[in-house]
Structures are given as C-alpha cells and as structure tokens.
Amino acid sequence: MKYITLIFGLLFFPTLIADAHLEAEQEVLSALQKYFEARNNEDYKTVVALESKSGTYGTNSDGSFHKPRLKTSVEQWKKANQGGVTNVFYPEAIQLSEDVVFVRFYSEGMVSVNDKASNYRTRVTMNWVKEEGSWVVKSQHYSAANYGGVHLTQPADFDD
C-alpha cells in the first residue's frame, strides 16, 4: 500500500506544479488578446495600461535597429499607430519564472499608412512581466515572416 501511495504521489504532484504554470500562461494569453484588440480598436488607454510603466523594449519587423526603452503614452500611440487590423495566430506562452512569461505567435492582417493598405505578416516574440499584480508587456520583437526566403513553406510545417 505504501508503494501505491508513493507512486500515486509522484505522478500526481508534478501535475499540481504544472497547473500553477498554466494559470500564469493562460492569464498572459488572455492579456495578449486584450492588448491586440485594444490596438486594433485604437483604445490606446488600454494599450498603455498593458505595457510596463518602466518602459518597453521593441524591435520592428522592418529590419531597423532595436529601439531604445520607451515609456509610451496615449498621445504617442495616437501619433505613431498604423491603421488596419492585425490578428494573433498560434500563440504559445511559456512561464520562465514567477513573474516572467515568454510568448510567441504570428501576426497577420492589413496595415494602413498614409491611406495605403498593405498585407502584414510577421513573427512576434514578447516578454510579459508581472507588475503590481498585473501582466504587462516588457519587450516585443517583430521579425518579418516573408513568403520565401531561406525556408520554403511545405506541408510538413503544419504537422503537429
């Protein structure tokens, strides 16, 4: 009986630990959806609230250099935001520590600059940190997911 209890405990205990991980990951994935919905709806007050108060680090998908730390404001978002709608596809979250979650996903849609609409497709990685009890964006890196390049998409890319 002792061995059955021990085996059951060894199998069950790791599940309890993993559940704590999954909770933070699910919270961040929910915040990620809220963040991009706010960006698409030009709700910059929500966007700014979901970014770190101490500033965020970013890299754009246009091939430019890394951006310096930026403390954003509603006014900055109004001035710099591209129009259009982008959607989050295949988001994955991995909790790195108690207060840091790494996220990666694809973003696709249409963006508009100076009334000119363009297709948009990029890979995104983000680090979310817990500040004052809430998950917020600390860093985001967008890298072009162009069609072609060094890897040609093939059916096996979509296999589980």
Regions found by a protein language model. Give the residues of each.
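Short beta-strand edge/turn micro-motifs at domain boundaries
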Residues: 121-151
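Surface-exposed, charged secondary-structure patches
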Residues: 71-116
